C-alpha cells in the first residue's frame, strides 16, 4: 500500500503548477489540511489568471497600433511631486512578443519586483532611453515644461526612431504621431515599462543622494516632503538638489 503524502509534502508540491490528475487526487483527500491547501491553490491560480488577463488587456493598446506603427514607444515620468532630485523620464520600445505579465503601473509593484522587472525590461526591450529634468531646469522652466523637455530628450535618445508614441498624461514636443493616455501606465505595457525604468533609476539616484546629503531621509522619502525631510530642511537648510521654486523649499531659504 502506497503511503499517503504528508500535508507538508503536498503544500510544497502545490507551490508550483500541478496536473489536473494531481489536483483531483488532492481534492479527494479527506484531510482538512489538504482541503485548505487545495482552496488556496485555486485562489492563487485564479489571481494569476486575472493578472495575466489584465496584462493582455493592457497589451491591446500596442497590438492595435503595431500593424501600422511597428515601433511603438511608451513614455512616462517619475518625480514631479518631490521637493528634491530630478524628474526622470523614460522611453521604451517593446518587442511584439513581450509577455512579462507582471509589468504594470510601477506604483502597484514592490521595490523588489520593480528591480527584477527593470532588469528584464532592459534585457528584452528593442530600445530604452532616459531623459532627466534637473532641479535647476525645473526651477527655470517650471515643472511641467521641464518634464516635457525631458520626455523629448528620452524619445530623441532612442537608438531606433519610434513610429508612434504612447505618453502618460502629457504631450511630447516632437513631430512623431502620439497619443496622450490618462493613467497610461495602467493601460499600456510600453508606458508601464517606462514607468518601471524611470522609477528604478530615480530611486537609485535618490539613494545615492542620501549618502551625499545625509539628514533628509532621501533614501526613504525619495525627495517627497515627508516630516523627516521637512525637519532636515529646517535644521540643515537647502542642498543643490532641492527645487527652489517649490514653496516648502523656499520657506527654508
From Swiss-Prot:
PROSITE patterns: RNASE_H_2
Amino acids binding a divalent metal cation: 76-77, 168
Record function comment: Endonuclease that specifically degrades the RNA of RNA-DNA hybrids.
EC category name: hydrolase
Name of the molecule in the record: Ribonuclease HII
BP terms from Gene Ontology: DNA replication, removal of RNA primer; mismatch repair
Organism expressing this protein natively: Latilactobacillus sakei subsp. sakei (strain 23K)
A molecular function GO annotation: RNA binding
Cited InterPro entries: RNase_HII, RNase_HII/HIII, RNase_HII/HIII_dom, RNaseH-like_sf, RNaseH_sf
NCBIfam families according to UniProt: PRK00015.1-1, PRK00015.1-3
